[in-house]
């Protein structure tokens, strides 16, 4: 287990209230022994949490939790904006924006996907896209959906289903102003989004070319159908100096 994984585990315990505000965490020595790692690794885990403002460490009192109980800041309930002018992302100031699909794969859903409403072991399709500005990766976006959803095609379309187009090949796009969901005939009722700031996992950091465990925004969007079943999930990651924006119409 590396420092990032230990930090993620401790962060979850803080969020769940196992370590409430003001509580003292294990010493570096005890944390290292608990996870079978070096004291340097344990110290790095606390440093990662400290960078997020979740803990404070000093020589006299050790490491204590500074995070308060987790809350939700709900930005509103709204309908999709005009898709003819909507942009999923863009450079904040200037630069050339590009986007590339780097991975398309089929796999059995791991246990952690149950939190998104996907049954463990179900066949899913995972698509990864890297967004760049002037050739430098800035955002990592992963989309996960049940295989049955990914295999759908527009009426009259012949060829590989758009969501199954391999990485590196041109994928057909929905006509301008039409949602992909409508184009592919998906039943879409609502999307729930959650934005957190936390250490990014190793694969994302590698894709963005940044140090492992670097903190970042994690934006999870779970889209469900009229029966409450998960249609697809998107997980977008970006470093903390980026911005997350939202338009609420009306």
PLM region spans:
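Short helix->loop/beta-hairpin flanking segments within DNA-binding domains
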Residues: 5-24
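A short alpha-helical element within helix-turn-helix/winged-helix DNA-binding domains
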Residues: 17, 24-35, 49
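C-terminal regulatory/effector modules of DNA-binding transcriptional regulators
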Residues: 119, 136, 145, 149, ...
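Hydrophobic beta-strand signal
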Residues: 32, 125, 217-218
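Hydrophobic beta-strand positions
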Residues: 129-131, 223-224
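HTH-adjacent hinge/linker in prokaryotic transcriptional regulators
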Residues: 1-7, 33-34, 44-123, 142, ...
